């Protein structure tokens, strides 16, 4: 590899001496590859079109056959063949054919101008009459046909993955369409996107362990946000009736095919709405964005057909658990009763689940969650695990909350928001007690947030959607790392360790 780099560096120096500086400032393409392919699909085989074009891109392949050479040039939209004829290039400038065939390698960025021709084999080509080195590559490309077989390398060096994998490029193109589609959908309905702090003095809005940092000038410990909820609710208190933020969230937790410590979510708050209104908003928005990104609301994910056409199934957590286990948690009045019934049904009973409501949630996670393949709104959660949600209007011990599950994964979470400041303080104090007892994911008491509620917050529906998981679904990607351009990775090796394997 070092020898190859040295050889390419010598070529770069030679180009410099020839006045073809290997790193150009600008180039002005007249067309993109896909545009040329579409506009000149009618050009017959073996014919030329006297249209002057200029294209730029990365050289992906090169074949030199005596007095002819064929390069494949790729830009963001597609590829086109470069037809290089010694006689034509030498007529423009002596030595040009030799220079381009000996000094240009696969991986180099090249700008060319010429006319169009279609080869006898039907390949639309630019017959090159002028060329310019735009950027000399000193490293070889991965194998064009096999791509990056090392999955870890795909994530660590995403730029290589994008060069050789059209599928990866399409994934991130769809991600961009999805993000812009969500913003457009909300903007068109008079929602305002307002940025909230990433650095916060209190980590709240979710049960999660935060990243901790320090502000040197203020000598102040700070947290990277684990949610945008509490600040967006402050904005509702301040009079913004429809507000959202789409951005990065940080949680100091484990990594898996579903979890990355840095991820993207959108949180949406609508005054005068509730969790039922948020269900309607969620299914309408996701269905429309899916239509824009995928061309329809029926998609294929990892061998399973998924129908995102509204309306979606709605079922309570109690109903789903009883359906899956035969256990009616509404009949249990003590934790001991629920625990005994769970053990008899073959369910695990974690000691940390210290109430009937927490055990209900455990039963749901163990027996129900993975089976929810088609989009399902799971509603009416235990109050113990929902400290920011409003008490249910007719079901004691529950809150007005739903989570959306698709292909067995939580994709969205929403509430009728808790706006009673006295109730909110009591619940956050209970959370603070759990935190003091060692629960690292429990929320603290944000006094300013409670004060904001005391100023007065209108009835509000709130929603959070995991963008990365939604992108996974719409791109048929099995891992969250496939849809995050640069996911956090374990170090390949540390100075005091042998290199890791796998």
Curated annotation (Swiss-Prot):
Q: Which UniProt keywords apply?
A: Aminoacyl-tRNA synthetase, ATP-binding, Cytoplasm, Ligase, Magnesium, Metal-binding, Nucleotide-binding, Protein biosynthesis
Which cofactor does the UniProt annotation name?
Mg(2+)
UniProt binding sites for Mg(2+) 1? 403, 410
- List of residues binding Mg(2+) 2: 410
**Stretches that traverse the bilayer:** none
Q: Where is it mainly found?
A: cytoplasm
Compartments where found: Cytoplasm
Q: What binding partners and quaternary form does the record give?
A: Homodimer.
Q: Which reaction does it catalyse?
A: tRNA(Lys) + L-lysine + ATP = L-lysyl-tRNA(Lys) + AMP + diphosphate
**Is the keyword Ligase in the record?**
yes
A Pfam family it matches: tRNA_anti-codon
Task: Return one Gene Ontology term, BP aspect.
Answer: lysyl-tRNA aminoacylation
Q: Give me the Gene Ontology terms describing cellular component.
A: cytosol
Cofactor stoichiometry and binding remark: Binds 3 Mg(2+) ions per subunit.
Protein name (record):
Lysine--tRNA ligase
């Amino acid at each position: 590899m070092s020898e190859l780099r040295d050889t390419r560096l010598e070529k770069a120096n030679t180009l410099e001496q020839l006045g073809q500086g290997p790193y150009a400032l600008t180039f002005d393409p007249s067309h993109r590859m896909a545009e040329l392919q579409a506009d000149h699909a009618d050009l017959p085989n073996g014919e030329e079109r006297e249209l002057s074009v200029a294209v730029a891109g990365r050289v992906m392949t090169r074949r030199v056959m005596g007095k002819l050479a064929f390069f494949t040039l790729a830009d963001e939209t597609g590829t086109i063949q470069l037809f290089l004829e010694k006689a034509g290039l030498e007529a423009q400038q002596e030595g040009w054919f030799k220079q381009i065939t000996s000094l240009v390698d696969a991986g180099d960025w090249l700008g060319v101008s010429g006319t169009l021709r279609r080869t006898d084999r039907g390949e639309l080509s630019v017959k090159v009459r002028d060329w310019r080195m735009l950027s000399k590559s000193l490293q070889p490309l991965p194998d064009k046909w096999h791509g990056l077989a090392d999955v870890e390398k795909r994530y660590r060096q995403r730029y290589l993955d994008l060069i050789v994998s059209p599928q990866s490029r399409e994934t991130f193109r769809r991600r961009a369409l999805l993000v812009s589609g969500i913003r457009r959908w909300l903007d068109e309905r008079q929602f305002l996107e307002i940025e909230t702090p990433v650095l916060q003095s209190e980590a709240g809005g979710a049960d999660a362990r935060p990243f901790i940092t320090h502000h040197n000038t203020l000598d102040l410990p700070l947290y990277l946000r684990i949610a945008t909820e509490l600040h967006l609710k402050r904005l509702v208190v301040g009079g913004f009736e429809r507000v959202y933020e789409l951005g990065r969230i940080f949680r100091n937790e484990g990594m898996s095919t579903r979890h990355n410590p840095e991820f993207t979510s959108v949180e949406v708050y609508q005054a005068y709405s509730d969790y039922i209104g948020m269900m309607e908003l969620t299914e309408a928005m996701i269905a429309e964005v899916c239509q824009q990104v995928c061309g329809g609301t029926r998609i294929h994910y990892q061998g399973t057909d998924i129908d995102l056409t509204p309306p979606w199934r709605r079922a309570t957590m109690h109903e789903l658990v009883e359906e899956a286990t035969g256990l009616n948690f509404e009949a249990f009045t003590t934790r001991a009763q629920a625990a005994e019934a769970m053990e008899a049904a073959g369910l695990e009973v974690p000691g940390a689940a210290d109430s009937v409501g927490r055990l209900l949630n455990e039963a749901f996670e163990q027996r129900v969650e993975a089976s929810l393949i088609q989009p399902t709104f799971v509603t009416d959660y235990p109050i113990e695990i929902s400290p920011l949600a409003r008490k249910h209007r007719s079901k004691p011990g529950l809150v007005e909350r739903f989570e959306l599950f698709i292909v067995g994964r939580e994709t969205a979470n929403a509430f009728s928001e808790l706006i009673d400041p006295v109730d909110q303080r009591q619940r956050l104090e209970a959370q603070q007690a759990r935190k003091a007892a060692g629960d690292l994911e429990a929320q603290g008491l944000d006094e300013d947030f409670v004060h904001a509620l005391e100023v007065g917050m209108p009835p509000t529906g709130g929603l959070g959607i995991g963008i990365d998981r939604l992108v996974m679904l719409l791109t048929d990607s099995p891992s969250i790392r496939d849809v995050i351009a640069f996911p956090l990775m374990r170090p390949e090796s540390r100075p005091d360790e042998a290199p890791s394997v796998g």
